[in-house]
Amino acid sequence: MDFKPQINLLKGFSDFNFGQTIAEAESIFGKPEESQVLDDDILETSCTVLHYWDLGFSLFFDNKNFKKFSSVEVDCEDTVLYGEKVFSLKEQQVIELMKVNGYTLTDTEQQEWGEKRLGFDEAGLDCYFENGKLSSINFGVIDDINSYQFLPN
C-alpha cells in the first residue's frame, strides 16, 4: 500500500473521512494489527480503536454514534499537515503553522507522564511534545454544542 499520512483537520485522515465506518477503514488500510474497545463510565463514552502500529496511527470509532470514525492518534514521522512534515517541527513552528492557517493556540498543559500538550480547540487538534520533540498528535471531529436537536415523541 502506498500510504501517505495526511492530517485533514475537521475532515479526516488521508483518504479516510470522519463519519466513515470500520469496514471502510479496513478496505482502505487493511486489517488492523490490534483492535480494542475503550469504555469510560464517568464520561459515558465508548469507542472501538483500530491500531495500525506499523503505519503509525490508531483510528477511533464512536460506539454511541453507530461506530463512526471520530478521531485519530498519529505518531508517524512522515505525517503531513498543511504541506509540512509536522513531526519535524518544533513547538513554536507548529503554533505558527496553525496560526497562518487560521487556528490559534487555545491552551497548553504539562501532562503527568511528562509530555506537554498544545491544544487548538477550533481545529480539534492536540499536539504532544516530549523533550521539545513532537511525539504524537490527536485530532478529530468537534461536537457542535449549537447542533442540539430536540426530537419530539
Ranges and model annotations:
Residues M1-N153:
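Short helix/turn-capping signatures at newly exposed starts of structured segments
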